[in-house]
Amino acid sequence: MACIIHTNRHNDTVLSKLQKDLSKSIEIGNKKYGGGQLKTVYVYQLDESVESRPCNIPFFYGLRLAKTNADVRIERPERKELATMGKRFVGTLRDEQTVSRNQALTLLTQHKSCILSCYTGFGKTVTAINMASKIKLPTLIAVPKKPLLAQWEQEIAKFIPTATVVVVDPSKIKSLPPQPECDFCIINTCNLEKLVKHDPKFVKTFGFLIVDEAHLQMTETMAENLLHVTPRYLLGITATPYRDDGYHVLFDMFFGPEMVKIKLNKKHTVYKVKTGFCPDESRYKKKKTLFHLPSRKSIGTPYWRSRPPIRKGTGSSWTLLRASRRAPF
């Protein structure tokens, strides 16, 4: 999920800004409090084998940079360069799903990227599939776990039964066609780098990228793999759009601040059931102690305080051994 900027076509001022902004010092292991280890993460990929030295930079960061700086030119695929996915969605969304879908589509039209953050059980997968049918572009779905591959495949077959779906098997990457004629492609993010090494043009055929469980994919390794994909529209799906380990800075660089957030406001019902059970309270009462610890005054001076300090060359053989192991001044 990146935009492309050709570094040889820009001046040193722009390149210095890129180097500064995309070299992030992240406090690894910082969960709500300080004390983590600082680590520099480079959030870009530079191809020096090409004369123009193209560089893949985070999606939203690239769009924002080009918008605020007239001298910057970025590459993002045009709709006319991509195929059309015109398959029909046969299901029906709930009212809250329809509202969130419309809000997300509006944000994608205006900002090209957003996050769909809804509570667990909301139906984010179905909503995203419906959005893909509205955008009408070949869709790449990146998931962080293997079980999610089959889950997405089943949901697509259920709601868009006429769609052609390709699930990338890492053991069969070499047999994939260079120009996949499919409506949906589902891949484990860990296998993206292997796929791009085999055929860099494969991922360029998709105009809509859906990043499932986005909070799990905002890590150094997975973000590096996702930089290979250059979509026209980007959607992140997560119920928890944050991280406590320092990598939260990647959210804004890739997806931006725009978010559709739906919270669960359902009231809980509490039922009171009479069981007739009466516990024996005497079993849980604290038992009285049969002895009392002596007070501090009655103990006197502790033995370890009454001993003289250990000095080198005096005392027992154990003392001399301990003293001889000290590092010299």
Curated annotation (Swiss-Prot):
Ranges where the Helicase ATP-binding domain occurs: 105-259
Binding sites annotated in the UniProt record for ATP: 118-125
Record flagged with keyword Nucleotide-binding: yes
Superkingdom in the source lineage: Viruses
Record Pfam families: ResIII
Enzyme class: hydrolase
EC identifiers of the protein: 3.6.4.-
Recorded GO MF terms: ATP binding; DNA binding; helicase activity; hydrolase activity
Protein name: Putative helicase 109L
Organism: Invertebrate iridescent virus 3
